[in-house]
Every structure is written in C-alpha cells, then in structure tokens.
Amino acid sequence: MSRFAIKQDRVIQGIKDLYEHKRAEICSRLDEFKEMWQAGTEEQIFCELVFCILTPMARGAMCSKAVENMTRSGILFKGNCAEIAKELTGARFINKKAAYIVEARDKILHGNPVSLRSILGKINDGYQAREWLVRHVKGIGYKEAGHFLRNIGFNQDLAILDRHILKNLKKLAVIDSFPDSLSRRQYLTIEVKMQEFSEAVHIPMSHLDFVLWYKETGEILK
C-alpha cells in the first residue's frame, strides 16, 4: 500500500477535483509543447531556453514579455549583454542573466554546427538531457532544465521544483520541510517523492505540476 494511501484528506481530494476540472486545459497546453518539438524552429527552441534562464526570481509573465520584445526587435539574436539587460527591467540579476543569454546564444545558436534539437535528439532521454543542459548552459539548473524540456515537448516526467510546487508538496506531506535551497541530491530525492505521489493519486507528473501551479496562481502558463 502506498504511503500516501492514508492521506486522503481534503487537501488531496481538492487536488484531484482541481485536476478533473482543469484536465482538458492542461492536455491542450501539453499538446502545444509537443508541437514545439515536432515543428518548432531552432530559434523558437532557443527562445524557450532564454525564457527558462530568465525565470529564477522572476514572474513568468514578465519573462515571456521580455522574450517576445527581444525577439521582435532582434536584440535576442544580435544584441550584446548591455542591450539585452535593458530589456529585463523588473527582473533580478539582469546583468548576469544577460551574460548567460549571450553565452548560450553564441555557443548553441551561432557557434555550434550541430543544433540543440540534434543534441537532445541524440541523447533521447529526459534525465540525461537535463544533465547535459545543467553542465553546458550557464544559468540553467535542474529546475530550469526540466522546465525547458517540458516546454519544448521533449520530456514530461521531470519535476519542476519551484517554490509553488515545493510549498504544495509540503502541504501534501510529500516532503517534511520547505528547503531554502536544493543540492542536486536533494532535488533528485524530492523528484522521486513527487513521482511516487503522482502515481499514488493517478495524476501524471506533467499534469500534477500544472495543477499545483494553478492552485497557487490561478493560471496555467508555460
């Protein structure tokens, strides 16, 4: 019997009810992500990587707007660090994030004869792809790498452990405490616990992420 079997209280039932209410919308959003992997351009995939580089300590809507503005103006693909930083008003660590974007662009988009899609396609495993991104792209940690791989439709089984998700995992007794920071070992340990909970309540990992995010924010964003 699952260790979550006796935890069928109002909180868990509320998660299940919310999932049934939002399931169709969640599936639609995930289908959009799959379309990105199947038909998106290399530039569109890079834009998703930039979005995920921007997300730490920043609102998703602001990150999306910044990427849209920089794409429209061409700064994202041609601008220097200072020009990109000017577009990140409202975010934290704008100079550092701008530098990460330029380095990723020069390494992945401009300086690599093999596309990011080809690299990930050869890896063909979500966990290994995440490790590759963490090792090779500055500004990308385990959360951001999982977020990126989900958003481009490459993998839907990785945990995206931001503060909203961690807060709810504690409420659901999946974890005992809210960690101030996460080492690689801690991240992977919590991911396994979230996967166990996902199986116990019969909500796929990628769907569960959206449900817990919606519970906190009232939105289903990317």
Model-derived features: positions:
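Alpha-helix N-cap and coil->helix boundary residues
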Residues: 61-65, 79, 96, 143, ...
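Short, hydrophobic/amphipathic alpha-helical patches that form generic packing surfaces
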Residues: 48-57, 103-106, 150, 209-217
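C-terminal accessory module of base-excision DNA glycosylases/AP lyases that mediates lesion recognition
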Residues: 1-36, 98, 113-222
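Hydrophobic (often cysteine-bearing) scaffold residues that line and stabilize catalytic clefts
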Residues: 42, 46, 59, 97, ...
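Structure-specific DNA junction-binding interface
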Residues: 1-73, 77-91, 221
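Amphipathic alpha-helical interaction segments
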Residues: 48-49, 83, 99-103, 147, ...
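Alpha-helical ds-nucleic-acid-binding substructure associated with the helix-hairpin-helix region
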Residues: 67-138
